[in-house]
Amino acid sequence: MSSKKNRKRLNQSAENGSSLPSAASSCAEARAPSAGSDFAATSGTLTVTNLLEKVDDKIPKTFQNSLIHLGLNTMKSANICIGRPVLLTSLNGKQEVYTAWPMAGFPGGKVGLSEMAQKNVGVRPGDAIQVQPLVGAVLQAEEMDVALSDKDMEINEEELTGCILRKLDGKIVLPGNFLYCTFYGRPYKLQVLRVKGADGMILGGPQSDSDTDAQRMAFEQSSMETSSLELSLQLSQLDLEDTQIPTSRSTPYKPIDDRITNKASDVLLDVTQSPGDGSGLMLEEVTGLKCNFESAREGNEQLTEEERLLKFSIGAKCNTDTFYFISSTTRVNFTEIDKNSKEQDNQFKVTYDMIGGLSSQLKAIREIIELPLKQPELFKSYGIPAPRGVLLYGPPGTGKTMIARAVANEVGAYVSVINGPEIISKFYGETEAKLRQIFAEATLRHPSIIFIDELDALCPKREGAQNEVEKRVVASLLTLMDGIGSEVSEGQVLVLGATNRPHALDAALRRPGRFDKEIEIGVPNAQDRLDILQKLLRRVPHLLTEAELLQLANSAHGYVGADLKVLCNEAGLCALRRILKKQPNLPDVKVAGLVKITLKDFLQAMNDIRPSAMREIAIDVPNVSWSDIGGLESIKLKLEQAVEWPLKHPESFIRMGIQPPKGVLLYGPPGCSKTMIAKALANESGLNFLAIKGPELMNKYVGESERAVRETFRKARAVAPSIIFFDELDALAVERGSSLGAGNVADRVLAQLLTEMDGIEQLKDVTILAATNRPDRIDKALMRPGRIDRIIYVPLPDAATRREIFKLQFHSMPVSNEVDLDELILQTDAYSGAEIVAVCREAALLALEEDIQANLIMKRHFTQALSTVTPRIPESLRRFYEDYQEKSGLHTL
């Protein structure tokens, strides 16, 4: 039954005043036992669930977003037709019109909504929502007011209006709905404030978000307290005027202007047809509810808090069955949003004072960007062309994107962000069209900044391009950047690019006139890290002093800005866990006042958070200290001079006019603690430690071995100060001409290694530590000063060193008092350090062989162990190291 017929039957029933009360009373008596459940069934209350992913392929994707999924039985019981519009009403009063679509096997009593639909209506899976067919007419919307954010106020409203009317033609809108459209490659979200129909009726604006949220919270709280209260009883306590004729609950709630009457009944469009006898049932519901309202009002004079809430949220609206849709002739008016939202947005804007450690880069960027945008006439008067582009390059996490956002916020320019891979399309010409749209919009809304992130993915070198799409994209971007200066907005549009692979960019893009300036955003040093930490901890409660902050900045080698931010977050979690561990039942308000970050929290967090550049090559630094190595005090001193002194006392080296040693080579017989010394150095220095085994770099493919060497040094520079440890260097740096392998792989690797250690590009804050037991096989070019400055011979341990080794071993072993340490030292004259440890281990095993419950290691066990473990370094090899030391002139310690 159409809306007109429903009105006609209602009028006929109203004229028969004598029959109305009787019908109402009979209806009320018949429904009294189960009024709440019947009302919920007829109102179409369903449970929200997620939209099914597998939908009919015949349905266009653009149309699938406007569908809701229902079961066939649910649609039949609710009188919902296939493909017809339905009204969704949530508990908080938000309404939206969608199209019903049946799904085979869909569970009954549920409605499938997309994530966007759930967000628009304000529901989540499991919530209750009312689904009703549109019983009435749909008119053309003559006028519509939409809210536009303040940053979009300068857009061409005429073009945006055309885009909205073209893409949303036929969509039924209500006040408070959100409209989504893509304009010049950028998504827009507009809120409908007011709708005026062709009949002259005006649907007013919705309540503010804060009011709606407050009402929703109050409603949820009241519903929890009165969950047993039936819906019919709640509705019966609403205060309605006697002169109003209530319509069916299945019609939507929309605010209307009572002064405006229907003037366009000739263009009404019937949306659904009710069943033949459905109007009679509707009349019974109306009269029954009318009687319930009147009887309840007589017996309940005072309203509870829940009743006043219901009266406020529902009684303030009227019922109407007229809806309005967008057409090509609808007039769209754009209004600015509330200024309160602006103030909230300003709190999260990135500014210059929030960026630490990049003062010199920020100064250069501001000179290039701010002057042309703020004072374009100055450049014109001197005839200086304004820069068109600035390229920021550096490792990930150093702050390139953050700088772009800060510049846009400080200058007040419009920002368009292009993420390289996002605009790439498989369709011919679509990627170039998106680029043209973005540049056209930026030109229209000048001053503007176009920020292209991951520029290397969008514009790689055309020589190595795999397909024609990449070449066309590069050509389009070159043309668009050349066209910036010829536009009316000369100097008002600037392209800001960011990449961590500048060598992969096309050469034509990096020439002056396109990207006029290239600024490196590198890994911060200790002073920069201190500045970053101070900025990050400015609003964080902590107990760190200036000295502790300086210590933390000095120890955070290789950490970039993003790593330090994650480090602060992890330290905060450590502090929170520390407080909750002591007082687990503390309320949240008191916990917030007690949580203060300390240096211990930061040190604990540094064990879990490693520099991002070290994650792919991170190794577990062994827990070996200098005290675990017996003797060798002079070697420890030499290593401290080469590694720790340049970091702790840089002014001393500057005062003396010398450079710290670049490389240290440890050579000597096997088992003399060369690798163990490297482990202790990695642990004691606290530097980033890269352990490289010589054979690991060798690869059977041409060029891969050299690339592995380059990558190793590149990573070391990225996390400087750092140590590269080459174990078994003789396998990697063999003397040139001695390699018999095909293609002279060893020679090429050696050449790459020599270039990296002392080539045109200076190796700064990276120390080379190598170990070998065959120094005669290493190429002489690698052994010269400037590459390997310190060559240290690690001989067999002398008597004093053997005493220290035995003491370290006896410290953790139950040794009997009859064991004579001096005698053991004399008996192990030609033993290496590893062999002495083997003697102690063998003695302990012999004691366990005699008695598995043994508590002491006796002298006889050591005597038997010495006969089992004999020196494995022959006299000839010892003589070889001594002769090599004398002939080569290498100094010993």
Curated annotation (Swiss-Prot):
Location of the region described as Required for interaction with AFG2B and CINP in the Swiss-Prot/TrEMBL record: 1-237
Task: Say where the cross-link Glycyl lysine isopeptide (Lys-Gly) (interchain with G-Cter in SUMO2) occurs.
Answer: 859
Annotated positions binding ATP 1? 394-401
List the CDD domains. RecA-like_CDC48_NLV2_r1-like, RecA-like_CDC48_r2-like
Q: Where is the composition biased (Polar residues)?
A: 11-25
| Localization terms from the record | Cytoplasm; Mitochondrion; Cytoplasm, Cytoskeleton, Spindle
UniProt keywords (A-Z) are: ATP-binding, Chaperone, Cytoplasm, Cytoskeleton, Deafness, Developmental protein, Differentiation, Disease variant, Epilepsy, Hydrolase, Intellectual disability, Isopeptide bond, Mitochondrion, Nucleotide-binding, Phosphoprotein, Repeat, Ribosome biogenesis, Spermatogenesis, Ubl conjugation
- Activity regulation, free text: AFG2A alone display limited ATPase activity and is not regulated by RNA or DNA binding. In the context of 55LCC heterohexameric ATPase complex, the ATPase activity increases and is stimulated by DNA binding and inhibited in presence of RNA.
Q: Quick one: where's region Disordered?
A: 1-26
What InterPro entries does the annotation carry? Answer: AAA+_ATPase, AAA_ATPase_domain, AAA_lid_3, Asp_de-COase-like_dom_sf, ATPase_AAA_core, ATPase_AAA_CS, P-loop_NTPase
This enzyme's EC code(s): 3.6.4.10
Q: Please tell me which top-level EC class this enzyme sits in.
A: hydrolase
Where ATP 2 binds, per the record, is at 668-675
The chemistry this enzyme catalyses reads:
ATP + H2O = ADP + phosphate + H(+)
Phosphothreonine is carried by which residues? 272
Result of changing residue 323 to I: Reduces protein stability
Query: Ranges of Basic residues compositional bias?
Result: 1-10
Complex and partners = Part of the 55LCC heterohexameric ATPase complex composed at least of AIRIM, AFG2A, AFG2B and CINP. Associates with pre-60S ribosomal particles.
Record-stated family: Belongs to the AAA ATPase family. AFG2 subfamily.
**Disorder cited:** Neurodevelopmental disorder with hearing loss, seizures, and brain abnormalities: An autosomal recessive disorder characterized by intellectual disability, intractable epilepsy, microcephaly, abnormal muscle tone, and sensorineural hearing loss.
Reproduce the free-text note on domains from the UniProt record: The first ATP-binding region binds ATP with low affinity whereas the second ATP-binding region binds ATP with high affinity.
Q: What is this protein called?
A: ATPase family gene 2 protein homolog A
Naturally occurring in which organism (per UniProt) = Homo sapiens (Human)
